[in-house]
Amino acid sequence: YAERDNWLSIYVEDNGIGIPKDEIPNVFGRVFYSSKYKVKQHRGIFGLGAKMVILYAQSTTNKPITVISAQQGSDKVYRFDIMIDTLRNEPLIKYQEEWDNKYKWHGTAVHVVMEGDWLKAKHRVEEYIKRVAMVAPYAEMHVKEPDGAVIDIERVTLTLPVPPKEGLPHPKSVDIEAVKQLISRNGDSPVSEFMVENFDGVGEETAANFLKSIGIDPGRNIKELNMDEITHMVTKMREYNEWRRPRADWLSPVGTELLEQGIRKTLEPEAVFATTRKPSSYSGNPFIVEAAVAWGGKIEPSDRPIIYRFANKVPLLYDEGNDVVRHVVDEVDWNLYKVKFPAPLVVVVHICSTKIPYASAGKEAIADVPEIESEVRLAIREVARRLRVYLSRKEKEKEAMMRYAMFTMFSREVASSIASILGIKEDQVLNKLKKVISRKIKYLEAIEEVEGDGEQQQQQGQA
C-alpha cells in the first residue's frame, strides 16, 4: 500500500449471486447479523469473519471497507463504504453510490486496507488458497500478491456439487434463545401449530403427543407460556426420541469424484482413494463425513500422516492438535494397512453440517462429538483398506518383477545350451523359455492373491 510500508490493500472479487442492496450495510456492518431464520449448510453467514476484518482494519488504519455488489439480473451495481459503530453495533455508511449494470455483472467485490506483515502471512495465505482448490476443483482462482507473485489455479472440472436446500430447524437442535426469537416473530398461535410451522419433521399428531407428554396443552397460545415453561419445553424437545431424523438435503458434500479430482490437482499423488459417508446426525443436526487418503507422487514422506481438515468446505489451518480428526488419525494402527513411516501419506477429512461443533470460538478445530468421531473413524478405515489393497498389489508386482529378472538372468545361457543339444536356433528356445517363466510367475501370483485375500479378511476384522 502506497501510504505505509506495513499497510496491505486487499481486494477480493467473486462472480456469485451478489447481495441485496438493503442487506449490504448490515451484512458487513453489524456483528452477528443474519437475515436467515432457516437452516442449511453455510461456509459462513457473515457472523464474525467479515466483521473481524473490518474491525481490525478500523483499529489499525481507520479506513472503511468498500463493498461493491450486484445480484443476478440486476440493472444496477451498488457500492457502500462501511465502518462499524462499535458502541451501537450498527453500520456507519461513509459513502454510497450506484450505477447502471451495463455489462450484466453479478457478484461481490470487497476492498479493505489493514496493517499486516506479508512476509509472515504469505505461507499461510498460499496454503489456504491451495486447500480451497482441493475441495473446490470447479473453482478458478487468480491471486496477485504484494510482492508481484501471481497464483493462477485453473478449474479441473465444470461439475458442481449439489447445493444445499433451506429448511426449518430440527426440534432437537434448538436452544432457549432460538425458541424465544421464534415466538417473538410468530404472533399469536396455538403451541401445537407453532411447533408444526417452525420445526422440521413435526406434524400435528407428533406435536400433540409431545406436548401432552410434557404437560402443556397443545391448544394453548404460545405467547402465554412463561419462561419456566419455555425452558421446560426446550429441554424436553432435546430429550424426546420420537422426532423424525433431520433431513440430509440441507447439506452439500464435496462428493467422492470431485474430492479425488481436487486432491490429484493439488497434491499430484500416485494414488487417491475417497469416500462420502451416509448422512448422520448429532443433537438434531445433520452431518456428513468425507475422507480420502493420498499416497506417493509428489507427497513428501513424513513421520506421521499429514492431515488436511475442512468444515463446510472451509480449510482449517490452526489448532490441529485439538481436532477430532487428529485424534482419530493418531489412534489408527497404520501397520494394519501396510504403511510404514516415514511414509508419503496424506489424510483428508471434510465434515459438512448445518451446525459444526467447533472446539472453541476460533473455529479452527472440531470437537470430539461421539457421533462425528465414529463417522470419521469409519470413513478413514474405509479408505485405508483400499490403500492397503493398492499397496499389496504394488508389493506383489515388485516381487513378480524381481522373480522375472532372476529367472531371465540366466535364461540366455540355458537357451544356448538347449539349442546346441537339440540343434535348433537359440532365439527360438529363448522365446519359449520366457513364455514358460511368465506362466509360472502368473501361477504363483494367483496362489498368493488367494492367500492374501484370506489374510486381508482377517486383518479387516481387526481394523
Tell where the protein language model's regions lie, with residue ranges.
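Helix-hairpin-helix
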Residues: 192-213
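GHKL-type ATPase core
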Residues: 8-9, 21-23, 34-181, 220-233, ...
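Charge-rich (often acidic), low-complexity intrinsically disordered regions concentrated
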Residues: 178, 184-187, 198-202, 233-239, ...
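ATPase catalytic-site recognition across NTP-hydrolyzing enzymes
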Residues: 25-27
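GHKL/Bergerat-fold ATPase module
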Residues: 151-177, 206-209, 216-220, 300-395
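Glycine-rich G1-box
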Residues: 17-18
